[in-house]
Amino acid sequence: MNLLKKKSLWLGALLLLLLGGATVFVIYKELRGQDIIGTLKNANIWWVLAAVCAMALYAVADGINISRCLKLAGYKISFAQMMRYSFAGFFFSSITPSSTGGQPGQLYYMAKDKLKVSHSAFTLLCALLSFQCAAVFLGVFGAVCSHGEVFKLNGKFAYVFPIGFALNIAIIIGLLCVLFTRRIAGFFAEIGLRLKKIKGLKPGDKFRFLRSFAAYRKAAFLLKLNKSVFLKMLITSLAQIILYHSVTFFCARAIGCSGLDWFTVLRTQSSLFISVSSLPLPGAAGVTEYGYALFYADLIPTELLGSVMLLSRFCAFVLPLIGSGLGLVLLSIKPKCGKGQIS
Protein backbone atom coordinates (compact mmCIF):
# COMPACT_ATOMS: atom_id res chain seq x y z
CA MET A 1 0.00 0.00 0.00
CA ASN A 2 1.56 3.32 -1.05
CA LEU A 3 1.76 6.45 1.10
CA LEU A 4 -1.14 8.21 -0.66
CA LYS A 5 -3.52 5.30 -0.04
CA LYS A 6 -2.46 5.08 3.60
CA LYS A 7 -3.05 8.80 4.06
CA SER A 8 -6.48 8.54 2.43
CA LEU A 9 -7.36 5.58 4.66
CA TRP A 10 -6.34 7.43 7.83
CA LEU A 11 -8.25 10.56 6.79
CA GLY A 12 -11.33 8.46 6.07
CA ALA A 13 -11.07 6.75 9.46
CA LEU A 14 -10.63 10.12 11.21
CA LEU A 15 -13.65 11.58 9.40
CA LEU A 16 -15.74 8.55 10.32
CA LEU A 17 -14.66 8.91 13.96
CA LEU A 18 -15.55 12.62 13.99
CA LEU A 19 -18.95 12.01 12.41
CA GLY A 20 -19.62 9.17 14.83
CA GLY A 21 -18.67 11.40 17.75
CA ALA A 22 -20.91 14.20 16.48
CA THR A 23 -23.80 11.75 16.12
CA VAL A 24 -23.37 10.42 19.67
CA PHE A 25 -23.18 13.99 21.01
CA VAL A 26 -26.36 15.09 19.21
CA ILE A 27 -28.26 12.00 20.40
CA TYR A 28 -26.99 12.50 23.97
CA LYS A 29 -28.08 16.15 23.90
CA GLU A 30 -31.53 15.18 22.58
CA LEU A 31 -32.19 12.42 25.11
CA ARG A 32 -30.33 13.77 28.15
CA GLY A 33 -32.54 13.58 31.23
CA GLN A 34 -35.34 11.88 29.27
CA ASP A 35 -36.72 8.43 29.98
CA ILE A 36 -37.02 7.26 26.37
CA ILE A 37 -36.76 3.58 27.41
CA GLY A 38 -39.66 3.93 29.82
CA THR A 39 -41.67 5.83 27.21
CA LEU A 40 -41.09 3.11 24.61
CA LYS A 41 -42.03 0.38 27.10
CA ASN A 42 -45.38 2.06 27.76
CA ALA A 43 -46.08 2.83 24.09
CA ASN A 44 -48.08 0.75 21.61
CA ILE A 45 -45.35 -0.79 19.45
CA TRP A 46 -47.52 -0.90 16.30
CA TRP A 47 -48.12 2.85 16.33
CA VAL A 48 -44.39 3.38 16.94
CA LEU A 49 -43.60 1.18 13.92
CA ALA A 50 -46.06 3.24 11.87
CA ALA A 51 -44.11 6.38 12.83
CA VAL A 52 -40.81 4.72 11.87
CA CYS A 53 -42.25 3.62 8.50
CA ALA A 54 -43.52 7.16 7.86
CA MET A 55 -39.98 8.53 8.31
CA ALA A 56 -38.54 5.81 6.06
CA LEU A 57 -40.99 6.80 3.31
CA TYR A 58 -40.09 10.45 3.98
CA ALA A 59 -36.46 9.66 3.11
CA VAL A 60 -37.50 7.75 -0.04
CA ALA A 61 -39.67 10.69 -1.18
CA ASP A 62 -36.71 13.04 -0.74
CA GLY A 63 -34.54 10.75 -2.85
CA ILE A 64 -37.21 10.51 -5.56
CA ASN A 65 -37.32 14.29 -5.95
CA ILE A 66 -33.53 14.48 -6.23
CA SER A 67 -33.48 11.69 -8.84
CA ARG A 68 -36.20 13.41 -10.91
CA CYS A 69 -34.17 16.57 -11.34
CA LEU A 70 -30.95 14.67 -12.04
CA LYS A 71 -32.75 12.58 -14.64
CA LEU A 72 -33.86 15.79 -16.35
CA ALA A 73 -30.21 16.88 -16.45
CA GLY A 74 -29.27 13.61 -18.17
CA TYR A 75 -28.11 11.43 -15.28
CA LYS A 76 -29.08 7.84 -14.61
CA ILE A 77 -28.73 7.12 -10.92
CA SER A 78 -29.49 3.93 -9.03
CA PHE A 79 -31.86 3.59 -6.08
CA ALA A 80 -28.80 3.24 -3.81
CA GLN A 81 -27.36 6.54 -5.05
CA MET A 82 -30.74 8.24 -4.67
CA MET A 83 -30.98 7.11 -1.05
CA ARG A 84 -27.36 8.04 -0.34
CA TYR A 85 -28.08 11.65 -1.33
CA SER A 86 -31.26 11.64 0.77
CA PHE A 87 -29.45 10.18 3.80
CA ALA A 88 -26.62 12.70 3.41
CA GLY A 89 -29.09 15.59 3.48
CA PHE A 90 -30.78 14.42 6.69
CA PHE A 91 -27.62 13.28 8.46
CA PHE A 92 -25.49 16.38 7.88
CA SER A 93 -28.43 18.71 8.55
CA SER A 94 -28.91 16.98 11.90
CA ILE A 95 -25.33 17.18 13.17
CA THR A 96 -24.48 20.73 12.03
CA PRO A 97 -25.54 24.04 13.66
CA SER A 98 -28.75 25.52 12.20
CA SER A 99 -28.94 22.54 9.78
CA THR A 100 -26.32 24.15 7.52
CA GLY A 101 -24.55 20.94 6.48
CA GLY A 102 -27.31 19.18 4.53
CA GLN A 103 -26.77 20.52 1.01
CA PRO A 104 -22.93 20.61 1.26
CA GLY A 105 -23.01 16.98 2.39
CA GLN A 106 -25.20 16.04 -0.57
CA LEU A 107 -22.94 17.96 -2.96
CA TYR A 108 -19.95 16.02 -1.61
CA TYR A 109 -21.53 12.63 -2.35
CA MET A 110 -22.73 13.81 -5.76
CA ALA A 111 -19.20 14.98 -6.59
CA LYS A 112 -17.90 11.54 -5.55
CA ASP A 113 -20.31 10.06 -8.12
CA LYS A 114 -18.84 12.37 -10.81
CA LEU A 115 -21.92 14.59 -11.08
CA LYS A 116 -21.25 18.15 -12.23
CA VAL A 117 -21.45 20.75 -9.46
CA SER A 118 -23.72 22.97 -11.58
CA HIS A 119 -26.26 20.17 -12.09
CA SER A 120 -26.02 19.04 -8.46
CA ALA A 121 -26.56 22.57 -7.13
CA PHE A 122 -29.51 23.14 -9.47
CA THR A 123 -31.06 19.82 -8.42
CA LEU A 124 -30.79 20.56 -4.71
CA LEU A 125 -32.18 24.09 -5.14
CA CYS A 126 -35.16 22.68 -7.08
CA ALA A 127 -35.77 20.06 -4.40
CA LEU A 128 -35.59 22.77 -1.72
CA LEU A 129 -37.99 25.01 -3.67
CA SER A 130 -40.45 22.15 -4.03
CA PHE A 131 -40.24 21.37 -0.31
CA GLN A 132 -40.67 25.02 0.69
CA CYS A 133 -43.69 25.50 -1.58
CA ALA A 134 -45.36 22.38 -0.18
CA ALA A 135 -44.57 23.42 3.41
CA VAL A 136 -46.00 26.92 2.91
CA PHE A 137 -49.12 25.54 1.24
CA LEU A 138 -49.76 23.13 4.11
CA GLY A 139 -48.88 25.81 6.67
CA VAL A 140 -51.38 28.28 5.22
CA PHE A 141 -53.92 25.46 4.93
CA GLY A 142 -53.37 24.59 8.60
CA ALA A 143 -53.66 28.23 9.71
CA VAL A 144 -56.91 28.70 7.75
CA CYS A 145 -58.41 25.47 9.10
CA SER A 146 -57.54 26.54 12.65
CA HIS A 147 -59.23 29.92 12.03
CA GLY A 148 -55.97 31.85 12.27
CA GLU A 149 -55.22 30.79 15.86
CA VAL A 150 -51.51 30.67 15.00
CA PHE A 151 -51.48 34.48 14.80
CA LYS A 152 -53.35 34.92 18.09
CA LEU A 153 -50.95 33.05 20.34
CA ASN A 154 -49.61 34.80 23.41
CA GLY A 155 -46.40 34.16 25.26
CA LYS A 156 -42.69 34.85 25.26
CA PHE A 157 -42.12 33.48 21.74
CA ALA A 158 -45.41 34.55 20.12
CA TYR A 159 -43.56 36.83 17.67
CA VAL A 160 -41.78 33.92 15.96
CA PHE A 161 -44.89 32.52 14.31
CA PRO A 162 -45.82 35.37 11.90
CA ILE A 163 -42.10 35.94 11.26
CA GLY A 164 -41.71 32.27 10.33
CA PHE A 165 -44.42 32.57 7.69
CA ALA A 166 -42.77 35.67 6.20
CA LEU A 167 -39.32 34.03 6.14
CA ASN A 168 -40.57 30.98 4.27
CA ILE A 169 -42.24 33.16 1.65
CA ALA A 170 -39.00 35.14 1.30
CA ILE A 171 -37.03 31.89 0.83
CA ILE A 172 -39.38 30.79 -1.96
CA ILE A 173 -39.06 34.15 -3.75
CA GLY A 174 -35.27 34.02 -3.39
CA LEU A 175 -35.08 30.47 -4.78
CA LEU A 176 -37.29 31.36 -7.74
CA CYS A 177 -35.04 34.31 -8.55
CA VAL A 178 -31.81 32.31 -8.27
CA LEU A 179 -33.19 29.38 -10.28
CA PHE A 180 -35.02 31.13 -13.08
CA THR A 181 -33.92 34.79 -13.27
CA ARG A 182 -30.87 35.08 -15.48
CA ARG A 183 -29.80 38.45 -14.11
CA ILE A 184 -29.84 37.40 -10.45
CA ALA A 185 -28.22 34.04 -11.20
CA GLY A 186 -25.57 35.93 -13.17
CA PHE A 187 -25.06 38.28 -10.21
CA PHE A 188 -24.25 35.35 -7.90
CA ALA A 189 -22.02 33.84 -10.59
CA GLU A 190 -20.10 37.13 -10.79
CA ILE A 191 -19.64 37.12 -7.01
CA GLY A 192 -18.34 33.56 -7.19
CA LEU A 193 -15.90 34.49 -9.94
CA ARG A 194 -14.59 37.46 -7.96
CA LEU A 195 -14.05 35.28 -4.91
CA LYS A 196 -12.05 32.90 -7.07
CA LYS A 197 -9.95 35.85 -8.31
CA ILE A 198 -9.15 36.81 -4.72
CA LYS A 199 -7.85 33.28 -4.08
CA GLY A 200 -5.99 33.37 -7.37
CA LEU A 201 -7.17 32.03 -10.72
CA LYS A 202 -5.34 29.17 -12.35
CA PRO A 203 -5.23 28.82 -16.15
CA GLY A 204 -8.64 27.66 -17.36
CA ASP A 205 -10.46 28.38 -14.06
CA LYS A 206 -12.55 31.21 -15.53
CA PHE A 207 -13.55 29.10 -18.53
CA ARG A 208 -14.56 26.16 -16.30
CA PHE A 209 -16.54 28.48 -14.03
CA LEU A 210 -18.43 30.08 -16.94
CA ARG A 211 -19.04 26.65 -18.44
CA SER A 212 -20.57 25.49 -15.14
CA PHE A 213 -22.82 28.55 -15.10
CA ALA A 214 -23.92 27.79 -18.67
CA ALA A 215 -24.75 24.20 -17.67
CA TYR A 216 -26.73 25.52 -14.69
CA ARG A 217 -28.73 27.85 -16.95
CA LYS A 218 -29.33 25.02 -19.42
CA ALA A 219 -30.75 22.84 -16.64
CA ALA A 220 -33.05 25.71 -15.60
CA PHE A 221 -34.23 26.03 -19.20
CA LEU A 222 -34.96 22.29 -19.36
CA LEU A 223 -37.07 22.51 -16.21
CA LYS A 224 -39.04 25.40 -17.73
CA LEU A 225 -39.75 23.20 -20.76
CA ASN A 226 -40.74 20.26 -18.54
CA LYS A 227 -43.03 21.88 -15.97
CA SER A 228 -44.68 18.52 -15.29
CA VAL A 229 -41.43 17.40 -13.61
CA PHE A 230 -41.67 20.16 -11.03
CA LEU A 231 -45.38 19.44 -10.56
CA LYS A 232 -44.50 15.82 -9.75
CA MET A 233 -41.81 17.05 -7.35
CA LEU A 234 -44.36 19.31 -5.65
CA ILE A 235 -46.84 16.45 -5.21
CA THR A 236 -44.07 14.24 -3.81
CA SER A 237 -43.04 17.01 -1.40
CA LEU A 238 -46.63 17.34 -0.20
CA ALA A 239 -46.73 13.60 0.49
CA GLN A 240 -43.30 13.82 2.15
CA ILE A 241 -44.34 16.58 4.57
CA ILE A 242 -47.67 14.90 5.34
CA LEU A 243 -45.73 11.75 6.27
CA TYR A 244 -43.45 13.80 8.50
CA HIS A 245 -46.36 15.51 10.26
CA SER A 246 -48.16 12.19 10.68
CA VAL A 247 -45.38 10.99 12.98
CA THR A 248 -46.83 13.11 15.80
CA PHE A 249 -50.25 11.52 15.27
CA PHE A 250 -48.79 8.00 15.37
CA CYS A 251 -46.79 8.81 18.51
CA ALA A 252 -49.82 10.37 20.23
CA ARG A 253 -51.82 7.22 19.51
CA ALA A 254 -48.92 5.09 20.74
CA ILE A 255 -48.99 6.91 24.08
CA GLY A 256 -52.77 6.55 24.39
CA CYS A 257 -54.34 9.74 22.97
CA SER A 258 -57.26 7.93 21.34
CA GLY A 259 -59.38 11.07 21.03
CA LEU A 260 -56.92 12.90 18.75
CA ASP A 261 -57.75 12.69 15.03
CA TRP A 262 -55.23 12.72 12.16
CA PHE A 263 -56.54 15.84 10.41
CA THR A 264 -56.27 17.93 13.58
CA VAL A 265 -52.65 16.86 14.00
CA LEU A 266 -51.91 17.58 10.32
CA ARG A 267 -53.21 21.16 10.43
CA THR A 268 -51.57 21.80 13.81
CA GLN A 269 -48.19 20.38 12.78
CA SER A 270 -48.32 22.24 9.45
CA SER A 271 -48.83 25.55 11.23
CA LEU A 272 -46.12 24.80 13.78
CA PHE A 273 -43.60 23.63 11.16
CA ILE A 274 -44.00 26.63 8.87
CA SER A 275 -43.78 28.95 11.85
CA VAL A 276 -40.43 27.82 13.26
CA SER A 277 -38.65 25.77 10.56
CA SER A 278 -36.82 28.70 8.94
CA LEU A 279 -35.98 30.74 12.01
CA PRO A 280 -32.17 31.23 12.20
CA LEU A 281 -32.11 31.08 16.00
CA PRO A 282 -29.55 29.20 18.11
CA GLY A 283 -32.39 28.07 20.35
CA ALA A 284 -34.70 27.01 17.53
CA ALA A 285 -35.19 23.59 19.11
CA GLY A 286 -36.37 25.24 22.32
CA VAL A 287 -38.73 27.47 20.36
CA THR A 288 -40.13 24.38 18.62
CA GLU A 289 -40.74 22.62 21.94
CA TYR A 290 -42.39 25.73 23.37
CA GLY A 291 -44.59 25.98 20.26
CA TYR A 292 -45.38 22.28 20.50
CA ALA A 293 -46.60 22.67 24.07
CA LEU A 294 -48.52 25.82 23.11
CA PHE A 295 -50.22 24.32 20.03
CA TYR A 296 -51.17 21.01 21.65
CA ALA A 297 -52.14 22.34 25.08
CA ASP A 298 -55.86 21.86 24.35
CA LEU A 299 -55.45 18.72 22.22
CA ILE A 300 -53.30 16.37 24.30
CA PRO A 301 -53.77 15.79 28.06
CA THR A 302 -51.07 17.57 30.08
CA GLU A 303 -49.88 14.34 31.71
CA LEU A 304 -49.25 12.78 28.27
CA LEU A 305 -47.89 15.81 26.40
CA GLY A 306 -44.28 15.35 27.51
CA SER A 307 -44.24 11.67 26.52
CA VAL A 308 -45.78 12.40 23.11
CA MET A 309 -43.24 15.16 22.47
CA LEU A 310 -40.33 12.91 23.48
CA LEU A 311 -41.51 9.94 21.41
CA SER A 312 -42.16 12.19 18.38
CA ARG A 313 -38.64 13.62 18.62
CA PHE A 314 -37.19 10.12 18.97
CA CYS A 315 -39.05 8.78 15.91
CA ALA A 316 -38.73 11.88 13.72
CA PHE A 317 -35.14 12.83 14.56
CA VAL A 318 -33.05 10.43 16.65
CA LEU A 319 -33.88 7.17 14.83
CA PRO A 320 -33.63 8.76 11.33
CA LEU A 321 -30.28 10.29 12.35
CA ILE A 322 -28.94 6.85 13.29
CA GLY A 323 -30.53 5.24 10.23
CA SER A 324 -29.22 7.84 7.78
CA GLY A 325 -25.72 7.58 9.25
CA LEU A 326 -25.69 3.79 8.96
CA GLY A 327 -27.25 4.03 5.50
CA LEU A 328 -24.48 6.36 4.34
CA VAL A 329 -21.81 3.95 5.56
CA LEU A 330 -23.43 0.88 3.98
CA LEU A 331 -24.25 2.58 0.66
CA SER A 332 -20.76 4.06 0.37
CA ILE A 333 -18.99 0.70 0.51
CA LYS A 334 -19.49 0.06 -3.20
CA PRO A 335 -20.38 3.41 -4.82
CA LYS A 336 -21.59 3.41 -8.40
CA CYS A 337 -20.91 6.45 -10.52
CA GLY A 338 -23.58 8.11 -12.64
CA LYS A 339 -22.84 9.61 -16.04
CA GLY A 340 -23.97 13.06 -17.13
CA GLN A 341 -25.29 13.63 -20.63
CA ILE A 342 -25.29 17.44 -20.63
CA SER A 343 -22.15 19.45 -21.15
Indicate residue ranges for each PLM-predicted region:
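Short, membrane-interfacial amphipathic segments enriched in basic
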Residues: 198-216
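Transmembrane helix-loop-helix hairpins in multi-pass inner-membrane proteins
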Residues: 1-38, 92-201, 281, 285-343
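Membrane-interface helix starts
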Residues: 8-11, 42-50, 221-235
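Transmembrane helical segments that form the transport core of multi-pass membrane transport proteins
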Residues: 220-274
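Alpha-helical transmembrane segments of multi-pass membrane proteins
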Residues: 80-89, 126, 263-274, 304-314
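Hydrophobic faces of transmembrane alpha-helices in multi-pass small-molecule transporters and flippases
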Residues: 48-52, 87-95, 125, 230-239
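A short amphipathic helical element positioned immediately N-terminal to and/or at the very start
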Residues: 34-42, 110, 212-224
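Membrane-embedded helical hairpins/re-entrant loop segments and their flanking transmembrane helices
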Residues: 63-87, 251-268
